[in-house]
Amino acid sequence: EFVFIQSKTNGQIKTYTGPIMVTISAQESMVVFNPKTKRFEETADFEKARQIFTSAPEGWYVVLKNPSIDGTHPDSAKAMNSPELQIGKKINISGPCSFSLFPGQMAKVVQGHKLRSNQYLIARVYDADAASKSVATIVDAEGKEVKAETEKYFVGQLLVIKGTEVSFYMPPTGIEVIANKDSYVRDAVTLERLEYAILKDEDGEKRYVHGPAVVFPKPTETFVNSPKGGVIFRALE
């Protein structure tokens, strides 16, 4: 566990990381960081002030906002001043890992993305330089871990990760997987013989795919709905 203590004289905030005995003077107060308002709020409730470590087991990863410039985390059993942070930056840290946060940092723990052959992910590049230097964790359809080839990315680029090629994926720093409602994994469309699907691109161009096939849309494509409902059309015999 850890807690933030702020000095009332100079406003400096220290991170107290357990195991440690905390004694609060009259010139100090406990504070908590509100991620919505991006402000520190004073509290006299120790149960509210103390926070648990950000922990990710094997096969999970942490999305950490505002990392320290040197990549360090608060030391255990110490009270530490906050180092200079990379405000506005975001990095991905693969598990297993466990650490407390510096004041102003925000973290989200995400399970690695498991894909069946008829599922896919859509990911977005938010930091092209970092994405080109980082390496994703990828397991292919045969269960073998593969090293992703370094690519040239551009900010805003959308990527489709197909379950026919990848069975497990954890994005490197610079790439984020886009959520689809309550899940990250999206279902492709499976076509049988005499069935087909129509995909419409942002430029109005249509693509027809005939079964049997598993159809993965491009990032800019959407399925055209059938008059009978759904996105699968039946060919005339």
Regions found by a protein language model. Name each.
Residues 1-237:
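N-terminal hydrophobic membrane-entry segments
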